[in-house]
Amino acid sequence: MTSERYNARDAEPRWQAEWDRQAIFATKNDDPREKYYVLEMFPYPSGRIHIGHVRNYTLGDVIARYMRARGYNVLHPMGWDAFGLPAENAAIERKIAPKAWTYDNIKAMKKQLRSIGLSLDWSREIATCDPAYYKHQQKMFLDFLRAGLAEREKRKINWDPVDMTVLANEQVIDGRGWRSGAVVEQREMNQWVFKITKFSQELLDALGTLDRWPDKVRLMQRNWIGRSEGLLIRFALDATTTPNNESELKIFTTRPDTLFGARFMAIAPDHPLAQAAAKDNPALAGFIAECKQRGTAQAEIDTAEKMGFDTGIRAIHPFDAAWALPVYVANFILMEYGTGAIFGCPAHDQRDLDFVNKYGLGNTPVVCPEGQDPASFVITDTAYDGDGRMINSRFLDGMSADAAKEEVAKRLEGETRGNEPVAERKVNFRLRDWGISRQRYWGCPIPVIHCPNCDVVPVPEKDLPVTLPEDVTFDRPGNALDHHPTWKHVDCPKCGGKATRETDTMDTFVDSSWYFARFTDPWNDSAPTTREVADRMLPVDQYIGGVEHAILHLLYSRFFTRAMKATGHLGMDEPFKGMFTQGMVVHETYRKPDGGWASPEEVRIEVDGNNRRATLITTGEPVEIGAVEKMSKSKRNTVDPDDIIGSYGADTARWFMLSDSPPDRDVIWSEEGVQGAARFMQRLWRLVNEAADAGKAAPQDRPATFGSDALTLRKAAHGALDRVSTGIERLHFNVCLANIREFANELADALARSRSNKSAPARDLAPDLSWSLREAAIILVQIFSPMMPHLAEECWQRALGQTGLVSQARWPQIEPDLLIEDSITLPVQVNGKKRGEVTVASDAGNPEIEAAVLALDAVKQALGGKQARKIIIVPRRIVSVVG
């Protein structure tokens, strides 16, 4: 047995260099074996990896190493999501060019990622800011343009007059730009959009085929697409109250059954009817201007106070010409949804109820819960949105809500106004086309030219890529491409006249919406994909990333795959067969006496029984241990991966990341847990060496028979192999590690039993036991190799004397006969309460099990001398006795 400690600092870089020297993780596209594509969401090159990256990439690496050992042709690439605003901010703040800042960061982060020991094919490395990548993105933009999947349209946008850029709704906070603090203006601008709505129904339907995606992710996408069936109703307007002879107001509703509960109409501030009414109404114009300064994120609108302005316009109820409904401009109605107008039924919609309570419009309940007396059913502060029977609804009274919807639809479809039906059935989607225009320098240029004679002219493909100029300055707000003295000035490729380039660049979500396809053949200079290779390697078998990307990134990637199929670049619809969203790495917080935050490195933790006490290392002052939260620089509860790897080694960090929690849940970082992982690594090293020593005298050939001790050990080894294999395939990594720990204990026990005399030489062991100990050590090394690959390589060659690399070894074959249990232990309940356990032969029949159960003293005592009335046996699960 070796007394030498395992030295991770020496071993890890040595094995990483050997993997690189032999290029063992490089994937060949012409490999005839079945492929397996595992991919983690590629990182933004911010300059440093964080501990969350270590977890994310370790999860994928375990899968990649396991599937490679199972004989698959594994594709496990890495690249950089390299365009984006932080590079421009760095240019402004640090006076460094975005390109230089980005590539410096890539160099630093690549070194860090290599130190984790990831089995990546670095030969396929891509950076989205590389013209060799984005020239193909520009080509696909032109393909989409020809196919009607990209177009230019006027859109209402949020304009930051200080930063001089368009802001997403989520970037407007209390009516101000999130970065500049300037009051945001609502403008109409020409924007490039991708027509994702052409695939609305298809994107929705296909969610049902993604059975290896988390249910919560599919639900989030389903809600974002937002399919709803309803009626488009044309409300007539009272001509005496409307401006410019406006005659009707169209609304889309999913609840036509509640029409008799209507108390008001509401339109968006930028609805054409609102704009027309405001021309001669300064107060209304002021209210609309105020609405335009509020936040436009849906979450902010939902929580803001509901405000409205009565336009004086009156809409006529479609079932009662004498029933006039006031038309309000309301701050909670968005022009982008439906028709930008609603009818308000306050009794059955909380938002509408809050509104009418504010303005004293009252409410009329029209759906009464089953069993409730309609005469006593009233609504005050809480709307009722459940099922029931119709009341206060004339010809609908007594119907179910569904029957009432159908009746309203039939009646209004049958009525006409101006040769058009008053209502028609419609399917509406919440999903809107994807606006990709960004007024930023550091992004993929949009390959079009604006000519005063020819309008919009695509850049000829022979002139791609349209590259970014490097001699730009950031000394004034706005897009540096607009300010460049020469870059945007070109000749029109169609007429030869003077023209200008498009200075908007693409949303960075475009860059990450197809990178997975480029990885299949990043060397193809003439096309975005090599179709035959892409169709063979895609879809990605296992995609891994944070749930924060559950909607936009995944939805845009699903659209892009379909658009690439429509333009001949791919042959499939879905990009990711399996999707896994890992939890975050969190850490407790520490607050100093002065109210500031202390980092974990500044704090000493002392444990006294169940109590933990924290003090500052430098002063000894007490520190308040706060809540466990997401790691953030502001609260200084971050952990530097370099420090952990430098102190303990990458394998320790990898093991800890996998062992503490199920991978879809948050893992709480603790120094004690990391130290425990480091101790276990040393234990494995000692255990493998001891087992290897004990197995040195083992015969080359498998013994014909095995004694009891050898057979027990072999069953433990193959049972662990089976459970770890299943655990990795099910992504139950923490369970795998628990099984490895359990098997390590069983191997240690077997070694202890084999030493009847501690000084006895290994050659004195029985051949079957010696062979079984060596087999067990080999299996142990192989099942922990996906998690601790460096330690596994060291054990494989130095301790076990194996040739080659464990990273290239085939996964051990499970012997099914060794998985058959000789006996099973079943819990025993009497009258629903557990009273004990019974161990019986695994092939025991019900009579034998019943006899063994009734012989238990605990069962006899629970029955109190009475006969059991019934014994229920759930095979291999539980025995229930009814007394």
Swiss-Prot record:
Short motif ('KMSKS' region): ranges: 630-634
Its EC number(s): 6.1.1.4
Entry GO terms, CC: cytosol
Molecular-function annotations in GO: aminoacyl-tRNA deacylase activity; ATP binding; leucine-tRNA ligase activity
GO terms, biological process: leucyl-tRNA aminoacylation
Subcellular location field: Cytoplasm
Intervals of motif 'HIGH' region: 43-53
Binding site for ATP: 633
InterPro entries membership: aa-tRNA-synth_I_CS (IPR001412), aa-tRNA-synth_Ia (IPR002300), Leu-tRNA-ligase (IPR002302), Leu_tRNA-synth_edit (IPR025709), M/V/L/I-tRNA-synth_anticd-bd (IPR013155), Methionyl/Leucyl_tRNA_Synth (IPR015413), Rossmann-like_a/b/a_fold (IPR014729), tRNAsynth_Ia_anticodon-bd (IPR009080)
Reaction(s) catalysed (UniProt annotation): tRNA(Leu) + L-leucine + ATP = L-leucyl-tRNA(Leu) + AMP + diphosphate
Chief localization: cytoplasm
Keywords, in A-Z order: Aminoacyl-tRNA synthetase, ATP-binding, Cytoplasm, Ligase, Nucleotide-binding, Protein biosynthesis
Catalytic class of the enzyme: ligase
One Pfam family in the UniProt entry: Anticodon_1
Family from the record: Belongs to the class-I aminoacyl-tRNA synthetase family.
Identification of the protein by name: Leucine--tRNA ligase
Gene: leuS
